[in-house]
Design a protein with these regions (language model features):
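Cofactor-pocket helix-loop regions in the catalytic cores of large enzyme subunits
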Residues: 1-187, 193, 206-397
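Surface-exposed loop and adjacent secondary-structure segments within mature catalytic domains
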Residues: 195-199
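Glycine-rich active-site loops that engage anionic ligands at enzyme catalytic sites
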Residues: 203
């Protein structure tokens, strides 16, 4: 929706916002650092609404817990949106200046009445009404979610439904307001930033953009296909069709993490060639033709990690990896070398500097600055740039870029 896969706010903003919706997230247990900031916000007067089928330890801190039925997130979100519109609380200024499709959205959610939503979600109509009015009228408000929203067959629709609420009320592009996916594992954000996506190059640059692609072609000495690749679900479909016959799996265990484990095991086991690179022999590794033992990135490798507020921080090697294990970067570079490609990296910093030369949002993040400042948030366009705490302030500019 916004063009880059990252939370729009910083952790500090949760300390100074007026309302926080924690949806499908038990952050007290899964994101304790973030939750520490959230509790400061609560103590400073922010209202906290927890949306979760379970009354989690995070929900215990909430002013209101909305215990919805499993899988009814879209019905609840659309009912909140409808109530905001019915009460005349939508932010018409923001809608008119920065959005498309309001009338279509309004028509779509019209059937999601409070009574309908109560039947579908199990959440009392009064609680839905309270959240809708509180969210729309709060001077600053944010929605934060985790895997309770994204680990569903309709995960994309879940996320879009939540983003619609933020766009409807204008709670984005300003300090203290935004949408914030709390990443499910360490450095998931960093993986996306580096271009581990089917339609993006590093720095969330579109692979279908000829000018951007040409920049990477020149730097890497290759011709990048001018079309998006497969996402994970599409890869398994391609295996089933016979269009994908070889897989290099790094730090991923789909035999156990896929919803349909039986299908995943069958398809991965039937590949012509499967390589697994991981810190121990996983269930997926047991099916592999080649297993490459990797170092643990959190203790045995140099590099960076990026957290859920887009903050890039240095990781320093503390231990030598055991046995024949090597760090991921070294393994990948050696595989490339044996295939006739020379990346020219001598260190993790070399690879990082290559990224900085190609990704404008990382350009100002030298290792020196990361060390001195304890981390920086992207975008950070040059070595004088402080990094941006929140994203999309452009949506409030005249005219909107």
């Amino acid at each position: 929706v916004f063009g880059a896969g990252g939370g729009t706010s910083s952790y500090r903003e949760t300390e100074e916002t007026d309302l926080i919706v924690l949806w499908g997230s038990n952050a007290r247990e899964t994101h304790p650092i973030f939750f520490h900031h959230l509790l400061r916000g609560v103590r400073n007067g922010a209202r906290l609404y927890a949306v979760d089928p379970r009354r989690t330890s995070s929900a215990e801190w909430a002013d209101v817990w909305l215990g919805l039925d499993v899988g009814s997130d879209i019905a609840l979100a659309n009912a909140i949106g409808r109530e905001i519109i019915a009460a005349g609380l939508e932010n018409r200024e923001f809608i008119d200046r920065a959005t498309d499709g309001f009338e279509a959205y309004k028509a779509k959610v019209e059937s999601y009445t409070l009574d309908f939503a109560e039947r579908e979600t199990g959440v009392p109509a009064d609680a839905i009404r309270e959240l809708a009015h509180a969210f729309a009228t709060a001077p600053r408000a944010m929605i934060c979610w985790t895997l309770g929203i994204t680990e569903h067959h309709n995960a994309v629709d879940n996320v879009v439904a939540l983003i619609n609420l933020v766009v409807l009320t204008g709670h984005v592009g300003r300090y203290g307001s935004g949408v914030n996916p709390l990443r499910g594992q360490n450095n998931v954000q960093g993986g996306g930033d580096m271009g581990a996506l089917p339609d993006r190059l590093p720095g969330f640059q579109h692979v279908e953009n000829d000018e951007l692609r040409a920049k990477f072609d020149a730097a890497w000495g290759v011709t990048i296909p001018p079309k998006r690749g497969w996402h994970l679900s599409g890869m398994f479909d391609a295996m089933e069709r016979g269009d994908l016959t070889a897989v290099y799996c790094i730090g991923e265990n789909p035999v156990q993490s896929e919803a349909d484990q039986k299908r995943a095991k069958h398809l991965l086991g039937g590949l012509e060639f499967l390589v697994v690179q991981d810190i121990f022999l996983t269930a997926t590794g047991e099916l592999a033709d080649v297993v490459l033992p990797a170092a643990a990135s959190w203790a045995e490798s140099e590099g960076t990690v990026t957290n859920s507020e887009r903050r890039v921080q240095r990781v320093r090697k503390a231990l030598e990896p055991p046995g024949d294990a090597r760090d991921d970067l070294g393994i990948i570079a050696e595989v490339a070398r044996r295939m006739g490609a020379e990346f020219g990296w001598e260190s993790a910093e070399d690879a990082w500097n290559e990224l900085r030369s190609l990704s404008p949002v990382h350009a100002g993040m030298s290792y020196r600055r990361l060390e001195e400042l304890g981390g920086l948030q992207w975008p950070c366009y040059d070595e004088d740039h402080p990094g941006e705490m929140f994203l999309h302030s452009r949506l409030w500019e005249d005219p909107v870029p």
